[in-house]
Amino acid sequence: MPRKGHIVKRDVLPDPIYNSKLITRIVNTIMEDGKKGTAQGILYGALNRIKDQTGREAIDVFNEALNNISPILEVRARRIGGQNYQVPVEVRPERRQALALRWLVQYAKKRNEKTMEERLAKEILDASQGTGAAVKKREEVHKMAEANKAFAHYRW
């Protein structure tokens, strides 16, 4: 905890093409070793592929995918009386979005298509249809929270 008060969260600038802060955030999630140009190339390429394949606006498909990936509940470890309990808690909106973006990129990297652009496009399409590894991860997290519902009264 900082001694000098609350730390103000810096806001990201919207990206130049889609004018969306969400797109900037996923570019930052994809980026490795400070190579933002490469990350933007991957994302814009993936969004173009999505638009070609579906005939819909890529940003709409992307938002739909994020809604399907975003977790509502998660479990947090809480130590009470020398024992650790997995306590289900609601996920704050900002963390919800961050987790969704992180899972999307993480599971896109694990796919076996040839290029990252292709993998990301396929994972976004799968997520928008309610399938794919990222959606499975969300279901897993929800199942864990549901299983530990008995400890919900330990919430803080």
Swiss-Prot record:
Q: Name one GO biological process term.
A: translation
**Keyword set, alphabetical order:** Ribonucleoprotein, Ribosomal protein, RNA-binding, rRNA-binding, tRNA-binding
Any one GO cellular component localisation term in the record:
small ribosomal subunit
State if Ribosomal protein is listed as a keyword.
yes
What Pfam families does the entry give?
Ribosomal_S7
Q: Name one GO molecular function term.
A: rRNA binding
Where do the coiled-coil regions begin and end? none
Question: Assembly and interactions?
Answer: Part of the 30S ribosomal subunit. Contacts proteins S9 and S11.
- What is the documented function of this protein? One of the primary rRNA binding proteins, it binds directly to 16S rRNA where it nucleates assembly of the head domain of the 30S subunit. Is located at the subunit interface close to the decoding center, probably blocks exit of the E-site tRNA.
Q: Which family does it belong to?
A: Belongs to the universal ribosomal protein uS7 family.
Name of the protein in its database record: Small ribosomal subunit protein uS7
Which organism does this record belong to?
Answer: Acholeplasma laidlawii (strain PG-8A)
